[in-house]
């Protein structure tokens, strides 16, 4: 009897697995009689009232967790606000970006990063005795595009210097850079709320760029614990630009936004091919702290004085790492100063997922690097004609594109305009503009009011509907998968009320999967053209949906929770014949029945 009951009650069986209810051990009797009196373990199977009260429903637990999380965030914001009031954070950024070139900076070796390790190296890359640097002029063009896009003054004459240090990834014992006379100076980058700056920074932050200099990259190191380290010299002498931003940033979020914006600018002008996500761009941040109620600090950086002692955090490889590392170093410095300690000028490291930075080495200064002019390289002379031609050929800057897309011509939200610009190296934006142009031609017979929202509708279909299909199928963007003309025709049919929104999505999916029939033919052959329901049919569907959930109807009436009408619209579309229920008309009928509001004359 007990065994039969246990088979039907797995939960009870779990409770019975106690020390007093174990199966017979080796050597014990195989047929032990059941106890005649109620056994203590069996009595424990009864669910007590106390146990029932302690059990918290999942929904209630989720609400409690959400409240606790909000409380933690409020406490964190309050702590950060108190910290900002007492301490001033200053951040400077140095960005190293690999240029979009086919050859290295001082040799004709390829810059391909997919070839066999140590296969793309020249004698000079490995510092063979007697080898000489040969400046590759093609590396200058993407560097100039970057400097112009970042609003820099291009210097007519610049020179190369040697930065001396000994490390395994630098075979020559020095790096060729432009420390004293860089090719570009005095630029800036503008940051706005849509770039992700901190709310307390207002609507606009301008970060100065002290200089941009050409320099060599180092070898790529790969560690294999416990003691093996391999070097790939394919990366040695890959052309880099180092962008030195002024220490004018006072918030970790704004620091990350600055790096993100500079990467977007570099990609928009084809100065680089990859960003942080693939290792083509790395950032170092300089962090300093000082008390607001004390005299200005005694240190200066980038021509700005009154700062605290700075530390440098090297080789940050993501935007989140930039923000998190600045927060961690800020907190560390505040803790040191509040305990009476002194901040040491040093180089520190950061590990993703960590909560604190770690010391790498004492900070080296200008004297330690022993900068000197490179005697093997002549001055770099840049003509005004070259600068003018490059300036005229640059694409429209991202900020101007956002302003255009969010303006009256297209009317997109900032949230939709940004990804259109940033996705697929501009291919998504070009496709979107083609769709809008074709759609406007198709809708020429409509009045201006009807055509006013076409660009916004096209943006939604390009970004969310078509983009969602690409994401779901894990496919890269391909404008030919759904030609711009085809998508414009689908939206045109939807605008003319010949198909419903659900049918439009169905047709888009069919074309995405390879159906190449013209849209009108596809709609006709698949019987997808809208056959409108009568008012009586809408009323019947609405009454059936309302009957499914009268409690929600009362909530809508009592608390004016109009958002819940969408649930009833969905029910009507599920109950009705596929492709015949129009969401707008269904909503109108529901409002009439539930709220007593009628749009009928």
UniProtKB/Swiss-Prot annotation:
EC number: 6.3.5.-
GO molecular function, one term: ATP binding
UniProt keyword terms in alphabetical order: ATP-binding, Ligase, Mitochondrion, Nucleotide-binding, Protein biosynthesis, Transit peptide
A GO CC term assigned to this protein in UniProt: glutamyl-tRNA(Gln) amidotransferase complex
Enzyme class of the recorded protein, top EC level: ligase
Catalysed reaction equations from the record: L-glutamyl-tRNA(Gln) + L-glutamine + ATP + H2O = L-glutaminyl-tRNA(Gln) + L-glutamate + ADP + phosphate + H(+)
Domain of life: Eukaryota
Annotated GO biological process: glutaminyl-tRNAGln biosynthesis via transamidation; mitochondrial translation
InterPro entries: Asn/Gln-tRNA_amidoTrfase_suB/E, Asn/Gln-tRNA_Trfase_suB/E_cat, Asn/Gln_amidotransferase, Asn/Gln_tRNA_amidoTrase-B-like, GatB, GatB_Yqey_C_2, Gln_synth/guanido_kin_cat_dom
Residue range covered by the transit peptide: 1-52
Subcellular location: Mitochondrion
Pfam family, one: GatB_Yqey
Gene3D superfamilies registered for this protein in UniProt: 1.10.10.410
Subunit composition and interactions: Subunit of the heterotrimeric GatCAB amidotransferase (AdT) complex, composed of A, B and C subunits.
HAMAP family referenced in this protein's UniProt entry, alphabetically: GatB
NCBIfam families: gatB, PRK05477.1-2
Function: Allows the formation of correctly charged Gln-tRNA(Gln) through the transamidation of misacylated Glu-tRNA(Gln) in the mitochondria. The reaction takes place in the presence of glutamine and ATP through an activated gamma-phospho-Glu-tRNA(Gln).
Family: Belongs to the GatB/GatE family. GatB subfamily.
Protein name per UniProt: Glutamyl-tRNA(Gln) amidotransferase subunit B, mitochondrial
